[in-house]
Regions:
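Short, structured secondary-structure boundary patches
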Residues: 4-7, 21-25, 130-140
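Short, solvent-exposed coil/turn linker segments
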Residues: 2-5, 80-81, 116
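A generic structural micro-environment signature
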Residues: 8-9, 24, 29, 126, ...
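Conserved C-terminal helix/tail region of periplasmic/extracytoplasmic solute-binding proteins
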Residues: 102-154
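Periplasmic-binding protein-like
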Residues: 1-22, 30, 34
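Secondary-structure end/capping motifs
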Residues: 25-114
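Weak global preference for isoleucine
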Residues: 8, 12, 17, 86-89, ...
Length: 154
């Protein structure tokens, strides 16, 4: 069997990454991005005409068609609602997946020169836990804007 991402559930994420200072200085950007994301999720997750059109468009953009894209979606863990995304990123499963990703990244030399262990970089999780170096945080999982979306407060 050819390797595909279904063999490592929870390890590959569709997410938007924004520089921490940029987001801090421009909170409207965070609101707009998260709002647009979940607006699209709401549309894509339905069998409405708009949902079908969105999946057909994204299928074409993914070098396949609507059926091929829907087959890909069927093999993925999708977070159609903000509350589902919040629950996942705060879970032990997400913590373990991020630990696995950083271990893999270190083993493959993806953490850069000078990385002497998987702890070289830090990953901040939403519950306040950190994987790796707390003085060298390079990735933060922050649920603030997802919570706003869940609360209808964007």
């Amino acid at each position: 069997r050819v390797f595909d991402s279904s063999q490592i559930p929870g390890h590959i994420k569709d997410l938007t990454i924004v520089n921490t200072e940029t987001l801090r200085d421009n909170p409207a950007l965070g609101k707009a991005l998260v709002g647009a994301w979940f607006e699209l999720m709401a549309e894509m997750g339905t069998d409405s005409e708009e949902g079908q059109k969105a999946r057909a468009f994204l299928g074409g953009a993914s070098a396949t068609d609507q059926a091929g894209y829907e087959a890909q979606l069927a093999g993925m863990k999708m977070f159609w609602q903000p509350a589902d995304a919040i629950a996942f990123i705060g879970s032990d499963e997400a913590y373990e997946a991020m630990d696995s990703v950083r271990q893999f990244s270190f083993e493959k030399g993806l953490l850069g020169e000078g990385a002497d262990s998987p702890d070289f970089v830090g990953i901040a999780m939403p519950d306040g836990k950190t994987l790796g170096d707390t003085a060298n945080i390079k990735l933060r999982f922050d649920t603030e804007y997802m919570q706003m979306a869940a609360d209808g407060a964007l």
